[in-house]
Amino acid sequence: MTVVVSDHQNPRPPGDDAAPLGRTGNRDRPPGSFFGRRKGHRLRPHQNDLVAQLLPRLGFDPARIGPSGPAALFDPPVDETRIEIGFGGGEHLVAEALAFPRAGFIGCEPYVNGMAKILVQIEAHAIRNIRLFAGDASQLLACLPPASLARIDLIHPDPWPKRRHWKRRFVQDATVAEMARVLRPEGEFRFVSDIDDYCAWTLTHLARSPDFLWLAERSADWQDPWSGYTMTRYGRKAMREGRRAAYLRFRRERTAV
């Protein structure tokens, strides 16, 4: 990983040369858009049963979230709500839910196989503080009231490496603004990727937002996982293949509007 960081407060991210922006003619992700496959390998019989029976109980319609916010989705009540966007096999999300039983977690994953995998883990651990949304995360964020989330995690997202596909990346000016709206003051957006270009892209987009501060004072702050981080299967594969990830944390500033 070659992201350049200076060892001082609020280091500057790479410039536009590292991540050219706005040259596709579409800066912002189209609302309600999803790009990619929704189903891959055939599900096992028990996974099919869980998708048919358990997923409807844990799923919800974002349009029905009222002024009380996503915390109302959970019973027993929770102290705060966090979201993980594109949770893959669910390793990180499940570990977080088990480690923080007083927090509510929403997992967004349109990929059916990912949903099936996490449902198996939810059943095995009798987890009660996870809710699932099998759609586009930008649609969910648009339905949330202001300052209703404590954290948003985006871990090893699809980098869409081809230039003509950059508009499909989740991190866009519009989604950064939406995250600032739904995160409470001092809330965090956390991003993990082993793709240099997407890390530079994310740093550049967040740096030009007045609503976020990059929480890195030294190189170790982004080169090493934060405390308690659970490595995903993809993350372990990247390490085996010699690719080093960056772990970026951004705080939602109190001056955001």
UniProtKB/Swiss-Prot annotation:
It catalyses: guanosine(46) in tRNA + S-adenosyl-L-methionine = N(7)-methylguanosine(46) in tRNA + S-adenosyl-L-homocysteine. InterPro entries: SAM-dependent_MTases_sf, tRNA_(Gua-N-7)_MeTrfase_Trmb, tRNA_methyltr_TrmB_bact. Disulfide bonds: none annotated. SUPFAM superfamilies: S-adenosyl-L-methionine-dependent methyltransferases (SSF53335). Substrate binds at residues 162, 194. Its EC number is 2.1.1.33. Keywords: Methyltransferase, S-adenosyl-L-methionine, Transferase, tRNA processing. Residues 1-42 are annotated as: Disordered. The active site is at residue 158. GO terms for cellular component: tRNA methyltransferase complex. One of its GO terms (molecular function) is tRNA (guanine(46)-N7)-methyltransferase activity. Pathway: tRNA modification; N(7)-methylguanine-tRNA biosynthesis. S-adenosyl-L-methionine binds at residues 84, 109, 136, 158. Belongs to the class I-like SAM-binding methyltransferase superfamily. TrmB family. Catalyzes the formation of N(7)-methylguanine at position 46 (m7G46) in tRNA. This is tRNA (guanine-N(7)-)-methyltransferase.
